[in-house]
């Protein structure tokens, strides 16, 4: 029966859990949604009475009312209500019995932004956990306002008019209270009586009041207090014995007060202290902050501190941030930051430091961010930051720096942000910058862009350094006079316009003049380009590409070989070419400093030839084998060549594609056309984006899918075979046994590559493994492709689709997968108390409550099981005792020892002689006692043991006697 009951209960629970939850009927101004099996009702501009009448007896879990019209609420007749929030309404009071209907269910109350004058009497709300009465007009608290709220853990009374607390107003909830927020009121002293002995209080906010001092013993016996906020008061003094038995304090916020002295020795009692903020006070000296093993952040901004003493922060092994900005610091003693191995941020901005002394920043070997902004520094040398090898951000803006010695930044290999804005820098000495720094901010300086500035300009271009932020004005030169007002990034292009001869020399046209301008020194690696050798741009790959690809361009001055060469030769200035040189300057400088051509450079170079008319008879005769792959990709992507309209260029592209198709078809048929290498360039001359497009099945411009397929088949046979040996030439179009590298697995690889990726960068071992259907070794891939797969890890699965079919073990697959190392974080995330919202605390409490329910359920089940075992044991023992009792009632005498009469003996003797029968002892002669009678009435006459045989004759004989 008991098992049937348990089964029935289980079925009932399953039925209830599977029942569909639906929203009830609601007023027009309300909205209903279901979240996490809870019915949430939100209303705007509605009163409680109307909502209750519409909802009726239906259950709702949460009720949110915005802009409500109630002035007084008489009743809350809602079934199952757990959360109520009345926001920005006109509510002034509650009836004493208003909460009676929800006493057993209500958990969270928020009455924020209303007109309450006093804390309502809530009654016996034994399940209430949080109460938020922020932003009302509460000025008084009844003595028994919180009686009956035995489970209350959070009480928020922020932004009211509370000037004092009755001594016993929080006695009913003191034992359970975890968070108390009374900030933004008019308290003039610590409410010690309501706080003392709050055994579970963890968060206390007394900010934005009128508290002037913390007296002795006012914060006493708070064993679990973790965070104390007394910011934005009129606090002048903290007495020596103010804190007693507050061992767990971690966060202490005292900013925006008028504290003039702070005894650091008293702070040493807080061994768990992590954050100390005494910003914007009146401290004349930095408090001694030593021997705080868990201290992570110290903020002493906005005080009157003039000096940081030696070992000011000693024995703080976990300190990560120090901020002493907005003080009057003129000196930082040597070893002030000794042994701060975990310090990553040091902010010393807005002080009066005039010089960085040797050893000033020693002891911070892992420092990453340093700000010395808005001081009075004038010079930097190699010893300034020598110990800061891990520095990534250095802010030196708004100083008076005019001299930076060579080697100042040599040891800062990880530096990527250097702010030198608003200083007195006019230029840089030789080799000041050797390693790449991605961002060097220079706005607000008086840069003199003379010849001594050339090396720095070359450094900026070669390393693609950003010199200003998007919202800042661009950097301008302030001298010499002919360069005044020239943008830094336009300087090289503007210099090209000053002399046509120098610009022509950059394009490979030798000039009779041997003049050297500023622009020539920008490009030392180009040097004199010598004679044209038949093509004006032969010494410059990009110009050579244009002139060899489009022969008609050679007729343009500066490009072709028809310009007179030799002594006395003269060239007529060409305005179009002058304008073009300015656009050419940017890409050419990058090439001159060791960079490789990229698509953006080609596009800039081509688009920088305004007003150049291209008259090209027979333009369609294009030699693709001499054309740069990037140029081909540029045109196929829709790029335009100045002087050629789009329709003409599209026609040329279509004609070229048709010629490619014709030549490929002829080659596959075994009849290659003459000069096919001009229209069918080798694979290394084709842009990788075009190869990927074709192999992915996308048609080429001007061709259909079948025509594109023929070109694909031609290039397929030009690819290396599976073993790295070039495939044999195709003898006939019908040959289907040729070695085809682009099998389905290879197509899958192409689809995973980034658009336009250069296939030549993929190792042949990987390609060969893919074409054979094997698992490739992904560790051999280049870094840029591994980074792409890191961002698209799902695409890696298709690489191993055939692994199962080939019986490849998981260990072999894992061995060939790349290892993505998690990057080291550059900084840490500071603690922010503002993230401690009521929802977070409530969520923690809800998780804790669920965990407790599970524990209680487990204990209850264990108890039931234990009781069941005890009952079974008791029943077994009882049964055994009954059996023993029955056996004890049996007469256990034998014939030789019986006390029977002679007649009985004779009868026994006669029966023995008459017929053999088993000997059966007579019944015991038990006297009739009250106990025996009771036992007899319960169990009947005592019987023999069931193992003995009953003799019918003996029974009848006894019955006659």
From Swiss-Prot:
Disruption phenotype: Lethal at early L1 larval stage due to excretory defects. Maternal copy required for survival. GO terms for cellular component: apical plasma membrane. InterPro entries: Leu-rich_rpt (IPR001611), Leu-rich_rpt_typical-subtyp (IPR003591), LRR_dom_sf (IPR032675). Its main location: membrane. Residues 890-943 are annotated as: Disordered. The chain crosses the membrane at residues 855-875. Coiled coil: none annotated. Residues 893-902 have a biased composition (Low complexity). This is Leucine-rich repeat-containing protein egg-6. The gene is egg-6.
């Amino acid at each position: 029966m008991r098992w049937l009951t348990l089964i029935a209960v289980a079925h009932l629970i399953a039925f209830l859990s599977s029942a569909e939850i639906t929203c009830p009927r609601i007023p027009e101004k309300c909205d209903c949604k279901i979240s996490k099996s809870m019915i949430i009702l939100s209303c705007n501009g509605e009163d409680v009475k109307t909502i209750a009448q519409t909802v009726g007896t239906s259950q709702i879990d949460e009720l949110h009312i915005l802009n409500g019209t109630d002035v007084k609420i008489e009743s809350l007749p809602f079934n199952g209500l757990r959360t109520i929030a009345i926001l920005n309404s006109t509510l002034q009071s509650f009836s004493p019995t208003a909460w009676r209907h929800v006493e057993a269910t209500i958990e969270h109350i928020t009455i924020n932004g209303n007109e309450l004058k006093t804390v309502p009497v809530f009654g016996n709300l034994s399940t209430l956990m949080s109460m938020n009465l922020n932003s009302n007009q509460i000025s008084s608290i009844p003595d028994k306002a919180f009686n009956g709220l035995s489970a209350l853990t959070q009480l928020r009374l922020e932004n009211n008019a509370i000037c004092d607390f009755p001594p016993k107003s929080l006695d009913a909830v003191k034992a359970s209270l975890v968070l108390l927020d009374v900030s933004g009121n008019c308290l003039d002293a610590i409410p010690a009586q309501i706080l003392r002995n709050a055994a579970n209080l963890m968060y206390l906010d007394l900010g934005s009041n009128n508290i002037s001092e913390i007296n002795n013993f006012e914060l006493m016996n708070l064993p679990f207090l973790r965070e104390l906020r007394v910011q934005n008061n009129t606090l002048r003094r903290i007495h020596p014995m103010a804190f007693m038995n507050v061992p767990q304090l971690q966060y202490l916020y005292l900013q925006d007060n008028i504290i003039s002295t702070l005894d650091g020795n008293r702070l040493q009692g807080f061994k768990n202290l992590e954050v100390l903020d005494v910003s914007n006070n009146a401290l004349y000296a930095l408090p001694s902050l030593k021997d705080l093993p868990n201290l992570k952040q110290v903020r002493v901004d906005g005080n009157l501190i003039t000096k940081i003493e030696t070992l000011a922060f000693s024995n703080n092994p976990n300190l990560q941030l120090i901020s002493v900005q907005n003080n009057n610091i003129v000196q930082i003693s040597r070893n002030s930051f000794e042994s701060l191995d975990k310090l990553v941020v040091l902010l010393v901005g807005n002080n009066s430091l005039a010089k960085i002394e040797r050893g000033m920043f020693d002891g911070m070997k892992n420092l990453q961010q340093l700000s010395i902004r808005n001081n009075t520094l004038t010079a930097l040398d190699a010893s300034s930051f020598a110990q800061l090898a891990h520095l990534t951000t250095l802010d030196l803006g708004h100083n008076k720096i005019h001299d930076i010695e060579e080697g100042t930044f040599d040891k800062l290999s990880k530096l990527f942000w250097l702010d030198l804005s608003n200083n007195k820098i006019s230029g840089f000495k030789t080799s000041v910058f050797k390693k790449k720094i991605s961002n060097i901010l220079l706005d607000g300086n008086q840069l003199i862009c003379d010849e001594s500035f050339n090396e720095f300009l070359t450094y900026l271009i070669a390393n693609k350094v950003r010199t200003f932020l998007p919202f800042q004005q661009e950097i301008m030169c302030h001298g010499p006079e002919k360069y005044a007002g020239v943008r830094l990034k336009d300087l090289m292009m503007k210099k090209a316009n000053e002399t046509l001869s120098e610009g022509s020399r950059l394009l490979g046209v030798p000039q009779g003049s041997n003049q050297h301008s500023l622009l020539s020194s920008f490009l030392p690696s180009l040097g004199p380009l010598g004679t044209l050798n038949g093509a004006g741009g032969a010494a410059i790959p990009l110009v050579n590409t244009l002139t060899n690809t489009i022969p008609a361009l050679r007729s343009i001055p500066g490009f072709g070989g028809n310009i007179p060469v030799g002594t006395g030769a003269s060239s007529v200035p060409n305005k179009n070419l002058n304008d073009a040189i300015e656009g050419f300057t940017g890409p050419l400088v990058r090439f001159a400093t060791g960079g490789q051509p990229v698509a953006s450079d080609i596009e800039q170079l081509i688009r920088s030839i305004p007003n150049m008319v291209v008259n090209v008879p027979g333009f369609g005769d294009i030699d693709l084998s001499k054309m740069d792959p990037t140029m081909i990709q540029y045109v196929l992507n829709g790029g335009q060549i100045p002087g050629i309209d789009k329709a003409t260029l599209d026609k040329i592209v279509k004609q070229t594609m048709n010629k490619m198709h014709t030549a490929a078809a002829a080659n596959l048929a075994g009849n290659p056309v003459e000069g096919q290498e001009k229209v069918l360039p080798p694979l290394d001359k084709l842009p990788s984006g075009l190869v990927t497009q074709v192999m992915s099945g996308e048609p080429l411009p001007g061709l259909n899918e079948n025509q594109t397929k023929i070109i694909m088949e031609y290039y397929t046979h030009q690819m290396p075979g599976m073993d790295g040996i070039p495939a044999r030439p195709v003898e006939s179009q019908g040959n289907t046994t040729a070695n085809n590298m682009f099998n389905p697995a290879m197509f899958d690889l192409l689809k995973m590559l980034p658009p336009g990726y250069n296939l030549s960068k993929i190792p042949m071992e990987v390609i060969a493994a893919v074409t054979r259907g094997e698992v490739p070794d992904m560790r051999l891939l280049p870094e840029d492709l591994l980074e792409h797969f890191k961002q698209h890890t799902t695409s890696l699965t298709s690489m191993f689709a055939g692994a199962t079919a080939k019986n490849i073990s998981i260990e072999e697959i894992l061995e060939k997968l790349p290892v993505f190392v998690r990057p080291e974080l550059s900084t840490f995330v500071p603690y922010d108390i503002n993230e401690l919202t009521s929802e977070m605390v409530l969520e923690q409490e809800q998780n804790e409550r669920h965990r407790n329910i599970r524990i209680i359920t487990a204990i209850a089940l264990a108890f039931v099981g234990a009781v069941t075992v005890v009952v079974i044991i008791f029943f077994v023992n009882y049964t055994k005792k009954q059996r023993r009792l029955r056996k004890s009632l049996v007469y256990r005498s034998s014939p030789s020892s019986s006390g029977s009469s002679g007649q009985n003996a004779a009868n026994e003797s006669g029966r023995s002689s008459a017929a053999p029968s088993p000997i059966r002892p007579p019944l015991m002669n038990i006297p009739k006692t009250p106990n025996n009678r009771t036992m007899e009435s319960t169990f009947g006459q005592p019987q023999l043991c069931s193992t003995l045989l009953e003799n019918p004759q003996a029974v009848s004989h006894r019955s006659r006697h």
